[in-house]
Amino acid sequence: MGRPATPQQTAFHIPFPRAISPDVSAVHPGSMAWLRRHGMLRSDASARRVDGWRLTELAGRFFPDARGEDLRLGADVMGFFFLFDDQFDHPGGLRAEAVAVSKRLLHLTSLPAGPAPEGAGPVVAAWADLWNRSCQGMSSAWRVRAAREWRRYFVGNLEESVAREGMSGESVEDYLRLRAMTIGTTPVYDLCERTQHFEIPDEVLHSHHVQAMRDLATEIVVLCNDVASTIKESARGETLNAVLLLERHHEAERGPAVARVQRMVEARLAAFRRLRDRTSRTCAALDLTAEQCDRVDRYVRTALMSVVRGNYDWQQRSARFSADDARPGSLPGYLDDLVGHSGVVGPPPVDGS
């Protein structure tokens, strides 16, 4: 086998079945319209760029059993994730406006689902809409843990922005711990339940067994993404990328660094499969019913495995990782400034105000 034409085409053997919702094409126009309606897409150029990222396809791969409005919700969340993430990619570092919006989002996660506050701006209003829709039909326990994962994500973006300016000597392991907060997989795992109409029993979700599987799945996604985005992030002078960290730490050439990341993925896949094969023992030890065990199995298949496999299949096709999509490091990573027009003035309101 010859070398891939680009890092984006690097092969990973993901031993999980390929799956995708049949409703991807049907929900795509509505999802793009939602992004425009909420001010997340402000120009035709941005719309063309996002269209090339194939985010509705990503949702279809992440949530293969989702249909109709459930898949639309998943697609809208994908649009939010990527457009919000890019707001932190600024040549001047972490912007005060991004911090202000993040604080407002963090405040909302502590409140019951409801309409966005007046004058919230596009990012906050869009997330409030997503959160309202996400909570529909879900238990209070799910809402509590889903809000917690969103908080970790919002805080993680701030931490990553600070680390981006100084993380050059840290190990790949340190980097992975930080990136696990911002890659967005843990809110997605929760959304897998919401869009596919089930909930994993709390007692097994919080077991070391399932938490270890979640951590492994997240690290696999991070590492695969880092390989695919190597050229794009190198061109922007990015430091938070496993391949680029290995090049600096070990003075490795690009090829050997990519090969090492491939081995890291293989090791994590092997560990994941060992845990998956022992899941029934954990269910038995927790004295779960047959119906509860079925939900655990579904979580493993249509949340963890579908995210790992779906991410890999998508990243090989998405323009998100192409060199053509990259902007010079002297420019922001976004086309539309969504937080500079946020309308947020001062700190978020205190509880009860």
From Swiss-Prot:
Pfam families: Terpene_syn_C_2 (PF19086). It comes from the Bacteria. It catalyses: (2E,6E)-farnesyl diphosphate = (-)-(E)-beta-caryophyllene + diphosphate. The keyword Metal-binding applies. Its cofactor is Mg(2+). Substrate binds at residues 179, 232, 320-321. A motif (DDXXD motif) lies at residues 85-89. GO terms for biological process: terpenoid biosynthetic process. Its EC number is 4.2.3.57. Mg(2+) 1 binds at residues 85, 89. One of its GO terms (molecular function) is metal ion binding. Pathway: Secondary metabolite biosynthesis; terpenoid biosynthesis. Gene3D superfamilies: Farnesyl Diphosphate Synthase. The keyword Ribosomal protein does not apply. It is an enzyme of class 4 (lyase). Keywords: Lyase, Magnesium, Metal-binding. The record marks 86, 160 as: Plays a critical role for substrate recognition. Catalyzes the conversion of (2E,6E)-farnesyl diphosphate (FPP) to yield the bicyclic sesquiterpene (2S,10R)-(-)-(E)-beta-caryophyllene via a probable 1,10-cyclization, which could involve the abstraction of the pyrophosphate from FPP to yield a (E,E)-germacradienyl cation. The Asp-Asp-Xaa-Xaa-Asp (DDXXD) motif is important for the catalytic activity, presumably through binding to Mg(2+). Belongs to the terpene synthase family. This is (-)-beta-caryophyllene synthase ((2E,6E)-farnesyl diphosphate cyclizing). The gene is ptlA.
